[in-house]
Amino acid sequence: MDYHDPYFFGYVLGFIHLLGTGAAIHALLTVRTSQGAIAWAMPLLFIPYFTLLPYLIFGRSSFDAYIKARREANKEMRAAIGSLNWRPWIEEAVAARRSDAYAALRAMPRLGNMPALANNKVRLLINGEETFGAIFQAIREAKQTILIQFFIIHDDNLGRQLQTLLLEKAAQGVAIFVLYDRIGSHALPGAYIDTLRDGGVQIKAFATRGGWLNRFQINFRNHRKIVVVDGLKGYIGGHNVGDEYMGLKPPLAPWRDTHVEVIGPVVACLQESFAEDWFWATRELPPLSLPDEFPEDGVLCQLLTSGPADAQETCSLFFVEAIHAAEERVWITSPYFIPDEAVSAALTLAVLRGVDVRLLLPSRPDHYVVYAASSLYAFDAVRAGVRVFRYEPGFLHQKVVLVDNDITAIGSANLDNRSFRLNFELMLLTVDSDFSSQVEAMLTADFAAAREISLQESHETRRLHQLGMRVARLISPIL
């Protein structure tokens, strides 16, 4: 081939445009939302030189082969777990159905893959010191099994504290299983992992597909955070394992996050969620433990698992259902705010019903493009009557929902497209007025440390900044 041929580069450009057209058609046929399909298709058609490679890496969001494989693995896992006489909580499930507050969430019994269960005890854990203090103490007291799953594990001070503690417990004969996301924990050195394995800890990476191909399919990430000790205590929330979550890394410090400790039958659901992801990574089941008896009283909880292999968009539908259930108020905190049309409409309708609708977002960005897109959506929400606040002391990372005076949800899901459709997420729904009062007090203090966004602020934003926000919003469906 004559590279000096004057037509050579024309052929190359034509071939790239042909590939871009094919990729655009693929996006239109496979991307799960119309906004996402358009956000991919337009640049693939007009500027394929810059978008073909990102589409290969971040696109292909239907990922049919993976979704099919994941669903098959889930069926295998449930068949294997069926022989264990699992879920012996008939009384707890019957009691849960008698809750008037839970009845307001009419879609939840069928939306959630796990049942709502009564007789749980929950404890609110505010920020990193309280959260990891409780988790580490529970690990120290472990006698049989420890299940740990995080999106991010860092080899820093907090990560090494966890490593040391797990090695001590493994030496005592405790069975330990650790699952981390390969993308979220990409910086975790092999030496950290090898040290745990050599010490008797079973540790695996969660990846959407084995081998080198996983490097090019990084959209699906396991964002869940789970710790279960001896089948008795469970922990779920927004923290990962890293010094930043302890508020030790400026400029995002102090870090604001929330976790929950739970004791009771819903801990079995946490184990089942962990087992599902562990089975995907290993094709083996971890040991699952049930206490001889559950507490005789306590609160109603339901674990909501969601992910890209679901038959429906579970996470987005959960937020829509929670917002629609609100009669007096719905307060939501999230580090990112990139809602889909259904969630935006639900927020607007809640305002029109006279509901006190509030959003608490960070005032400091950890991802500038996402922050810019979130800012424009925040201005739209303010124009719709939603009260939007920016938390000022540090970075806000907690994911909390408070509905009226009885319903709360705390976990890993953000109010954005990635959590709605791409990530594996986990939320703990709690129906109890006393616990809701604790969450209300926590959020009231957070709102007191925040600045409310005004309509005037949106008008005063510089045109160049507005342009940047609109470009960010244009690509927000694929962020």
Curated annotation (Swiss-Prot):
GO terms for molecular function: cardiolipin synthase activity. The keyword Repeat applies. The active site is at H223, K225, D230, H397, K399, D404. The chain crosses the membrane at residues 8-28, 38-58. Keywords: Cell inner membrane, Cell membrane, Lipid biosynthesis, Lipid metabolism, Membrane, Phospholipid biosynthesis, Phospholipid metabolism, Repeat, Transferase, Transmembrane, Transmembrane helix. Belongs to the phospholipase D family. Cardiolipin synthase subfamily. ClsA sub-subfamily. PANTHER family: CARDIOLIPIN SYNTHASE, PHOSPHOLIPASE D. This is Cardiolipin synthase A. It comes from Pseudomonas syringae pv. tomato (strain ATCC BAA-871 / DC3000). The gene is clsA.
